[in-house]
UniProtKB/Swiss-Prot annotation:
Lineage: Bacteria, Pseudomonadati, Thermodesulfobacteriota, Desulfovibrionia, Desulfovibrionales
Gene Ontology biological-process annotations: tyrosyl-tRNA aminoacylation
PANTHER family per record: TYROSINE--TRNA LIGASE, TYROSYL-TRNA SYNTHETASE
Transmembrane segments: none
Location relative to the cell: Cytoplasm
UniProt motif ('HIGH' region) ranges: 42-51
S4 RNA-binding domain: residues covered: 341-397
Enzyme Commission code(s) on record: 6.1.1.1
Protein name: Tyrosine--tRNA ligase
Organism annotation: Nitratidesulfovibrio vulgaris (strain ATCC 29579 / DSM 644 / CCUG 34227 / NCIMB 8303 / VKM B-1760 / Hildenborough) (Desulfovibrio vulgaris)
InterPro entries in UniProt: aa-tRNA-synth_I_CS (IPR001412), aa-tRNA-synth_Ic (IPR002305), Rossmann-like_a/b/a_fold (IPR014729), S4_RNA-bd (IPR002942), S4_RNA-bd_sf (IPR036986), Tyr-tRNA-ligase (IPR002307), Tyr-tRNA-ligase_bac-type (IPR024088), Tyr-tRNA-ligase_bac_2 (IPR024108)
Length: 398
């Protein structure tokens, strides 16, 4: 096993919070592989780069010789995670959950080593729970403690409904740690409450409490909200190489450092050196961003496809095929940087209604990537906009 201080340095890279470092050190000092758990509810059919923040951290643990458990919450997916919700999440059908879970299994091994990964389903133990078992589990936690959770407290004060089954979600997730005898559980910062419930339940069931490692939520392409398919600001790991490369090139110069730290394989020293070179003018931020887009596209599609995507992107962005007299337009990030707004302001369309119609028909591309979202603003940066076959625009979003 690697030296404990080096392990801790590797483990803490990019993490938001570790509870408790002293406890984790003691676990590592035993010299036996730890059981590292991270759960994923298959509520959508595809993984995106936001999900991979946790998966990469699991990979770090694999590289350190520990046992990784990729837990698919096929049972909890039927309940619906209330974390960060202002309303009750509609439950999925069993068929939807199983179909999504199968896709997850196929996608996750683009990052994890399948030989060092245990894939499990929490229906394996929760499916056998009866009414009496649930009542006994519910007795291990209080309503007062449950109401300390920010989203529940807020909804209660605002008079919005909280369904009883939503109280079960953190209990079931917590019991997963009991069933798996987890030493460490990973989750996003929005999962901290649920992870702490797991620690509590392990103590209640006579187990040594798991350590908790929370990871930041990766901002989406807009640089504001967390990456989410429902918000349209995501990069799916199964997207075409051209779309993946183009979307990554659209992130702001500042946001790219966040992506480097959380989802690239570069060392922290390498990232710091790249940042220094950009700040001193030794390297152009576009070229550094291009190296990030190339690295990630290579990971999910291979080097040949990444090279093709890079060439295709540069053919558009560097001016190939873009008329010298293409109009130039600048706008502020926000409402003015939504496609209908900047297309109308730049004179490429007569009205926002016309812009929305053309977008719906698939006529708009941003940096060579088709754009079907008429509502989300583009992040700060420079773009080549193409509308139809002949209309171009060089756009700067401040």
């Amino acid at each position: 096993m690697i030296d404990i201080d080096r392990q801790l340095e590797h483990i803490k890279r990019g993490c938001a919070e570790l509870i408790d470092e002293g406890e984790l050190r003691k676990k590592l000092e035993r010299g036996t592989p730890l059981r590292i758990k991270a759960g994923f509810d298959p509520t959508a059919p595809d993984l995106h780069l936001g999900h991979t923040v946790l998966i990469h951290k699991l990979r770090h643990f694999q590289e350190l010789g520990h046992t990784v458990i990729f837990l698919i919450g096929d049972f909890t997916g039927l309940i619906g995670d209330p974390s960060g919700r202002s309303d009750t999440r509609p439950p999925l059908t069993r068929e939807q959950v199983l179909a999504n879970a199968e896709t997850y299994k196929q996608q996750v091994f683009k990052i994890l080593d399948p030989e060092k990964t245990v894939v499990d389903f929490n229906s394996r133990w929760m499916g056998e729970f009866g009414a009496a078992d649930f009542i006994r589990l519910a007795s291990r936690y209080t309503v007062a403690r449950m109401m300390e959770r920010d989203d529940f407290e807020k909804r209660y004060k605002e008079g919005r409904p909280i369904a009883v089954h939503e109280f079960l979600y953190p209990l079931v997730q917590g019991y997963d740690s009991v069933a798996l005898k987890a030493d460490v559980e990973l989750g996003g910062t929005d999962q901290k409450f649920n992870l702490l419930v797991g620690r509590h339940l392990q103590s209640q069931y006579g187990q040594e409490p798991q350590c908790i490692l929370t990871m930041p939520l990766l901002e989406g392409l807009d640089g504001v909200k967390k990456m989410s398919k429902s918000l349209g600001n995501y990069v799916g790991i199964d997207e075409s190489p051209a779309d993946m490369f183009g979307k990554l090139m659209s992130v702001s110069d500042e946001l790219m450092w966040r992506y480097f730290e959380l989802i690239s394989s570069r060392s922290l020293d390498e990232i710091a050196d790249l940042r220094r070179k950009v700040e001193t003018g030794e390297a152009h931020p576009k070229l550094v961003k291009e190296s990030l887009a190339y690295e990630l596209t290579t990971r999910y599609h291979g080097e040949d496809k990444a090279a093709e995507a890079q060439q295709g992107f540069n053919a558009v962005f560097a001016g190939g095929g873009v008329p010298d007299d293409a109009p130039v337009h600048a706008c502020d990030h926000g409402d003015d940087s939504t496609p209908p707004a900047f297309l109308e302001a730049a004179g490429l369309v007569k009205s926002r209604g016309e812009a929305k119609r053309l977008i719906k028909e698939g006529a708009l591309s941003v940096d060579g990537v088709r754009c079907d979202d008429a509502n989300s603003p583009l992040a700060s940066g420079e773009y080549v906009i193409k509308l139809g076959k002949k209309r171009f625009l060089r756009l700067t979003v401040r």
